[in-house]
Amino acid sequence: MNRPLFVSLDGPKGTGKTTLLEAVTQVLRAGNQKVIRLCERKSDPFRGETMALVNTLARNPCRDLEWAVCQRLADSRRWISQNVLTKQPLDSIILIDRWYPSDAAFRQTIPFAEILQLNMERDVRVPDLHVGVVTDPDISWARAANRSRGLGGTVIQKHAEHVACTEMFEQAVKDHGWMLCRNEGTVEEATMLVVSRIHEVLGLNVEVDARLGAQGIA
């Protein structure tokens, strides 16, 4: 490829997405792949202002405010696309923790089709592989509750809302043909699925051992 392979991992809260991303990174690096790990939130220089707007939206839910949040996020992704993604080594694999697919879970009044169009109009880079990480909502809710930071969400506060956002996200995965990764078993199982798909996109014939790394590149 003449540019890095760009892979996004998205999903509702508590699905083990960040842990999975770390495990995928480890396995790919064990197979001598150059991996760049990014986080949308940490790469966004405007996140403080956006989160202030998200907090306002949480207190006063309305479509206009939510659309403003969507616009700010799309503008930030355009900035990341132009100023961060383009600076990575051409022979690398970029794994990013959240990108525009996450809006399918967290936006409540704006149809995702409109959000997707907005991001495309902003020239946000389209991932070469979208990975949607999901679990049964009861499992992810319990996982989130057991974390030190809890659910850690501003938009989603109630179990019923979490169930609804999980259902919306899974529907978006189906509608757009993204990779669905059910992370209800071991992290090794989910890691093997994701790494195997990345190798498939790269056109590599690789035997994957999620514990030992990638072996046998053809």
Positions of predicted regions on the chain:
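A glycine- and Lys/Arg-enriched "phosphate-lid" helix/loop adjacent to the NTP-binding pocket
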Residues: 103-168
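Hydrophobic anchor at the beta1->P-loop junction of P-loop NTPases
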Residues: 9
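Conserved lysine of the Walker
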Residues: 17
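Hydrophobic positions on the alpha1 helix immediately C-terminal to the Walker A/P-loop
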Residues: 20
